[in-house]
């Protein structure tokens, strides 16, 4: 592990609508502790002294972003969101190039709806991967018993959970390598669910860095309620 923390750029893909939340607005704009989820997700990066700049990918017709105080932050640039996450991230990487980022610069991609990232986890990721030839991501070992099922919901087998980890964010890779992996996988119409899967598709083996299990992504209403209760108990 490196004792230094490398400088980095951050990308936040925030063009999704979060349909499973069944809310009146995209989930990243729901309130949590007096601010939007997106503002919390951005905050851990904006507070970090090693940040070189940040790009947030937004839907072209996003009516909520301009009302946020952070929209005027000069460290934040806006990129056009794509129809899928990979397109949003790719557009953000192109924006980073325009800002002067080089192919060997580190880029951290973080979910817009993952507001509980701790500074300790961010520092751990940066330190552990500072000299890594590939990069990697925060992740958490599977704790529950896992079942593989058929299309009818019948159990086929119990999976060895010692080999299974849940992928979290941030995910940290060199700009040039990530750009090539995403662009090539899109041309090949490969199934890409996160940046690590694009790197895997390109033949790389990202490293997993164990993080906190409470760095959850808000996907369903109960996730947001859990965070609200947890944050209320901190007071």
From Swiss-Prot:
What chemistry does it catalyse, as a reaction equation? Answer: 2-C-methyl-D-erythritol 4-phosphate + CTP + H(+) = 4-CDP-2-C-methyl-D-erythritol + diphosphate
- Record's keyword terms, sorted: Isoprene biosynthesis, Nucleotidyltransferase, Transferase
Pathway terms, separated by semicolons: Isoprenoid biosynthesis; isopentenyl diphosphate biosynthesis via DXP pathway; isopentenyl diphosphate from 1-deoxy-D-xylulose 5-phosphate: step 2/6
Record's SUPFAM superfamilies?
A: Nucleotide-diphospho-sugar transferases
- Pfam families assigned: IspD
Instruction: List the residues marked with site Transition state stabilizer.
Output: 20, 27
S-S bonds? none
Q: What does this protein do?
A: Catalyzes the formation of 4-diphosphocytidyl-2-C-methyl-D-erythritol from CTP and 2-C-methyl-D-erythritol 4-phosphate (MEP).
Q: What NCBIfam families does the annotation carry?
A: ispD (TIGR00453)
Q: What is this protein called?
A: 2-C-methyl-D-erythritol 4-phosphate cytidylyltransferase
Native source species: Pseudomonas fluorescens (strain SBW25)
């Amino acid at each position: 592990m490196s004792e230094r923390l490398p400088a980095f750029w951050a990308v936040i893909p925030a063009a999704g609508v979060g349909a499973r939340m069944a809310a009146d607005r995209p989930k990243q704009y729901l309130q949590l502790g007096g601010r939007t989820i997106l503002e919390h997700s951005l905050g851990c990066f904006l507070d970090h002294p090693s940040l070189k700049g940040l790009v947030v990918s937004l839907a072209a017709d996003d009516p909520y972003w301009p009302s946020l105080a952070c929209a005027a932050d000069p460290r934040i640039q806006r990129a056009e969101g794509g129809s899928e996450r990979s397109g949003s991230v790719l557009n953000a990487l192109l924006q980073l190039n325009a800002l002067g980022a080089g192919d060997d610069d580190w880029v951290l991609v973080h979910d817009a709806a993952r507001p509980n990232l701790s500074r300790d986890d961010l520092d751990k990721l940066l330190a552990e991967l500072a000299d890594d030839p590939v990069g990697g991501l925060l992740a958490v070992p599977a704790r529950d018993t896992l079942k593989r099922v058929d299309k009818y919901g019948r159990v086929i087998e119990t999976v060895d959970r010692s080999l299974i980890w849940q992928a979290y964010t941030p995910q940290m890779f060199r700009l040039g390598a990530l750009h090539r992996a995403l662009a090539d996988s899109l041309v090949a119409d490969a199934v890409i669910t996160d940046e690590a899967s694009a790197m895997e598709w390109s033949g790389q083996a990202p490293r997993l860095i164990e993080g906190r299990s409470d760095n959850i992504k808000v996907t369903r209403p109960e996730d947001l309620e859990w965070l609200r209760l947890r944050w209320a108990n901190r007071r």
